């Protein structure tokens, strides 16, 4: 087929991203990461797995990033919703700093956050729900940008997966509009 390499994202792990029990989620992701490590070790020059982390606490997140890096993973799939505060909080600065230090891109996938979650009920016809599945990635990007995360960590690499890209120019326009007109009262 002419495929030279593959980046492997979890499927079932997307559902577990929204599980409310962070201890359960952490155990599932640790087991998945061990399995994925073994699977990718058959052809490490061609198979690149994305480790999953639970982000139960920022300290756990740092440890999970370090463990994934030690296993040779080249990127991390993050849950859309952490357990402690939100991703713009400075309590996550050690996580972002660790990702930069280890050169690990952090990936946010559609359907893994509260906005556009896989189990959310769409408004109107079911097909309308398909239009909203990118919302979680939009929310993450707005949170990181307006929250100053990229100002504090300019070398942080973030990937939005299966969220298309057509929304980006309009979203940038909306962000500029919000900032220019509403930044003083919408902090």
Whereabouts are the PLM-identified features?
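Acidic active-site catalytic centers that drive phospho-/nucleotidyl reactions
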Residues: 2, 33, 109
């Amino acid at each position: 087929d002419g495929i030279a390499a593959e980046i492997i994202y979890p499927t079932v792990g997307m559902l577990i991203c929204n599980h409310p029990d962070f201890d359960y989620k952490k155990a599932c992701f640790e087991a998945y990461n061990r399995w994925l490590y073994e699977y990718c070790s058959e052809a490490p020059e061609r198979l690149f797995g994305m480790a999953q982390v639970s982000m139960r606490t920022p300290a756990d997140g740092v440890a999970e990033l370090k463990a994934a890096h030690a296993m040779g993973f080249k990127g991390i799939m993050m849950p859309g919703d952490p357990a402690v505060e939100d991703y713009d909080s400075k309590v996550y600065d050690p996580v972002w700093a660790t990702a930069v230090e280890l050169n690990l891109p952090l990936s946010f996938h559609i359907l893994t956050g509260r906005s556009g979650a896989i189990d959310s009920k769409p408004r109107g016809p079911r097909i309308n729900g398909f239009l909203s599945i990118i919302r979680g990635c939009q929310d993450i990007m707005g949170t990181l940008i307006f929250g100053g995360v990229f100002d504090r960590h300019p070398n942080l690499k973030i990937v939005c997966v299966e969220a298309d890209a057509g929304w980006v120019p309009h979203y940038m326009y909306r962000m500029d509009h919000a900032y220019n007109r509403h930044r003083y009262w919408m902090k």
